[in-house]
């Protein structure tokens, strides 16, 4: 039986270009940063009323693209360059994009079409996106340092 302290991760394959590992780590870090920006802006528009609340809602909507774009590019890099070296990370990168699109879409259903029933779904996806983004970001940094 191995404990957490005894367990070691599988080595990173050396045939993965350092540039791919670095780009993936940077992009997942940027996506994670925008997840936190999303949380900040959501707390601001929930607290604000009137024009100020609408402004924060607009900012919240636009910063979603700051999450989606780097997450999508990171998933493409993972599929192209990291899938054999880090298969779990690759799959979770794709799941992050899918969850982010679900969060983005539900946000638009709420803000554009005023379908407030989607709020619980949107909040659930935000938790999934946060957990995935942080985990992927930490793991990508570890892979980059080991490689």
Regions found by a protein language model. Give the residues of each.
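Polytopic transmembrane helical bundles with strong interfacial aromatic enrichment
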Residues: 2-147
């Amino acid at each position: 039986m191995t404990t957490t302290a005894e367990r070691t991760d599988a080595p990173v394959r050396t045939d993965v270009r350092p540039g791919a590992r670095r780009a993936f780590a940077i992009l997942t870090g940027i996506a994670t940063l925008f997840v936190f920006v999303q949380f900040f802006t959501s707390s601001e528009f929930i607290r604000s009323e009137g024009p100020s609340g609408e402004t924060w809602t607009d900012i919240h909507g636009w910063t979603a693209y700051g999450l989606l774009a780097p997450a999508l590019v990171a998933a493409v890099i993972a599929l192209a360059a990291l899938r054999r070296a880090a298969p779990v990370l690759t799959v979770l990168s794709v799941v992050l994009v899918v969850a982010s699109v679900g969060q983005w879409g539900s946000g638009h259903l709420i803000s554009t079409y005023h379908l407030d029933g989607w709020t619980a779904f949107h909040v659930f996806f935000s938790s999934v996106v946060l957990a995935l983004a942080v985990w992927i970001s930490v793991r990508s940094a570890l892979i980059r340092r080991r490689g």
